[in-house]
Amino acid sequence: MKLVWLGHSAFRVELDGAVILIDPFLSGNPKFNGSVAEASAGATHIVLTHGHDDHIGDAPDIAKATGAQIVANFEVCMFLNGKGAENINPGNTGGSIDCGAFVVSLTQALHSSGTTENGQSIYLGNPNGVVITPKQGPTLYHMGDTEIFSDMALIAEIYNPQIGIVPIGDRFTMGAKTAALAVRRYFKFDAVVPCHYGTFGLLDQSPDAFIAALGGSGVKVDAPAIGGHMIY
């Protein structure tokens, strides 16, 4: 599995011939200086955790350009279908979606989900974390935007993820110390990748506090620069 951080909560996952984009907020991200076309080249699937603009991001345009299938909760899929995304594969919390080379499972997250158009709020279902279980290789858990919650223990028991993607930026998600507590208390990750930090001034700007809080835990923390990648 090759995992590329594209900034904020956006990732590119390459496994067994599939190219998965998670929450591809790219052109609107002031810290992303790459090419959307290059970042999304060969995309087969777009997996979305929830309906906020900084997570849906470029998903509709990428889906139209590449034909990638959008996998998300029902409301997000229907909303994007109305925006011209034809290849959708909806699910909901607790469900799993077989995508061939991998399975996507939608887990609970403590957050909100929606957007605003013409001054009106649009409800876009419950927020999710996503577990990507490949036919071969490590299981990946992207927590989405969330606070810590005790049922993370059930996610660990059910899916046994080896790689964790963890929001740490505070303000709109849990902060570094709470995120580290979640990792320590509920999971047995081989490696974790922090996200949802440094994008805007309201967020924590560095993963340093998260890394320090996991000191001595035995969990490897991979915190690449935007565009950097890991092989698992």
From Swiss-Prot:
UniProt entry tagged with the keyword Hydrolase: yes
PANTHER family for the chain: UPF0173 METAL-DEPENDENT HYDROLASE MJ1163, UPF0173 METAL-DEPENDENT HYDROLASE MJ1163-RELATED
InterPro entries (UniProt xref): Metallo-B-lactamas (IPR001279), RibonucZ/Hydroxyglut_hydro (IPR036866), UPF0173 (IPR022877), UPF0173_UPF0282_UlaG_hydrolase (IPR050114)
Organism of provenance: Methylocella silvestris (strain DSM 15510 / CIP 108128 / LMG 27833 / NCIMB 13906 / BL2)
Entry keyword set: Hydrolase
Family statement drawn from the similarity comment of this UniProt entry: Belongs to the UPF0173 family.
Family matches, as Pfam families: Lactamase_B_3 (PF13483)
Record flagged with keyword Transport: no
Protein name, UniProt field: UPF0173 metal-dependent hydrolase Msil_0741
GO molecular function per UniProt: hydrolase activity
